[in-house]
C-alpha cells in the first residue's frame, strides 16, 4: 500500500531512535504504520505529539517507512487528567489491535471525532465504551446486544455470559462475570442513564477485548491506576 500521497494522521506513540531521530507509530485512514522521523529535535519533532491533527507523507515500501513531510492540520486536542489517560488508552488499543497498514477509515473517523470531545470535558466513560465497541465491530469481533447466540431476544430479567467468539449465552446459575439482560438492552440503546449500564458496559468491553489483547497488561491502564493510588501533595 502506498503512503506517498498526503494523508491525515495522528501520532499514537513516539520514542527516540538513534541520535537525532524518533520511531513513530502513526494512525491514518489507510491504517497504522511505523516510520522514522529524522531531525526529531527540531520543528517536526515538536509536531509529532499525540492528539494533534497532522498531515504527512512517507517514503519506503517496507514495514518501516521514513517521514517525508509532516505538518499541522488543525488545533491540538489538549487532554489533561483523566482525559489524557483515556486518550493514551485509545492509542494503546489501536497499536495493540490494528494490523499494520490495514485501512480502517471508520475507526480513524471515530477516533478523530472522539479526541475533541475528550478535550472538551465530555463524560469519559460513554466515549470510551463507544470507541471500544466501534473498534471491536470494525475488526470483526463484534456481537449482538439484543439477541443471544441462538438469535433469541435478550430477556431483561435473564442472566447472560459473554462468549467472546460467539456472543451472549443465557445461563441459569449465578456465577461471576454475568450480565443482567436489562443492562445489555440499555447498552444496545446507548442508554447510559440506566442504573448499572455504564459499569456493566465497562466489564463487558474488558471481557470482549481481553482475548485480542493477549496476556500483556495495558500500560495506560497501569499508569492511570498508579496515578489514582499515588498520595496527593
Swiss-Prot record:
Record keyword DNA repair present: yes
Keywords on record: DNA damage, DNA recombination, DNA repair
One Pfam family matching this protein: RecO_C
TM stretches of this protein: none
GO cellular component annotations of the record: bacterial nucleoid
UniProt-listed InterPro entries: ARFGAP/RecO (IPR037278), DNA_rep/recomb_RecO_N (IPR022572), NA-bd_OB-fold (IPR012340), RecO (IPR003717), RecO_C (IPR042242)
Example of a GO biological process term: DNA recombination
Functional summary from the UniProt entry: Involved in DNA repair and RecF pathway recombination.
Annotated family: Belongs to the RecO family.
Protein name in the entry: DNA repair protein RecO
